[in-house]
């Protein structure tokens, strides 16, 4: 495929965000034991910073990075999923309706995970930006915060598996390597 047949879709900041988030979440998830708390906390702060960046970039970034380019009504998302299941889904240059919904779900789940992570860090370790607000919280409440944090971390993993499955399915359906596109920024031009 030559450059004349390709179109730039993913800007460098979206690509750096995506792969940095993959790495930071993996480090945070797999360093969740007490002996790795320092690494877990740093990775969690990085995840939070990346999510906050992406929320801003969703309003001020280039066309395909903007939420306005890929947020659809739930009925449109459901119709698109039906088309995927019948192998008749149209191809999108940017995010398709299901991909847009997944981005919102992932960002929301990651934001909840990190905010509750900060709460756990403050309540159990007396550290972080919420330490003063959560000083003296009972062990049962601290445990509840930790349960919520862990639930959303695990829910995020479920979303990640669904996201990867969607990327593989779309890649096969449209004969296009979407993983490569997230590295290079380029996709095949419209048909």
Where would I find each of the regions flagged by the language model?
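Membrane-embedded alpha-helical bundles that constitute the cytochrome b-like, heme-associated redox core
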Residues: 1-191
């Amino acid at each position: 495929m030559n450059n004349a047949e390709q179109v730039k879709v993913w800007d460098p900041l979206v690509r750096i965000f995506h792969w940095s988030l993959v790495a930071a979440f993996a480090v945070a998830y797999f360093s969740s034991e007490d002996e790795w708390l320092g690494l877990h906390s740093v990775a969690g702060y990085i995840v939070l910073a990346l999510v906050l960046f992406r929320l801003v970039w969703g309003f001020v970034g280039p066309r395909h990075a903007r939420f306005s380019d890929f947020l659809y009504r739930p009925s449109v998302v459901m119709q698109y999923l039906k088309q995927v299941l019948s192998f008749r889904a149209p191809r999108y240059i940017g995010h398709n309706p299901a991909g847009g919904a997944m981005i919102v779900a992932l960002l929301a789940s990651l934001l909840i995970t990190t905010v509750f992570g900060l709460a756990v860090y403050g309540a159990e370790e007396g550290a972080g930006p919420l330490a003063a607000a959560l000083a003296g919280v009972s062990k049962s409440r601290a445990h509840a915060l930790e349960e919520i944090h862990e639930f959303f971390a695990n829910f995020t993993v479920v979303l990640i598996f669904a996201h990867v499955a969607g990327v593989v399915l779309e890649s096969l359906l449209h004969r296009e390597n979407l993983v490569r596109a997230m590295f290079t920024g380029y996709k095949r031009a419209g048909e």
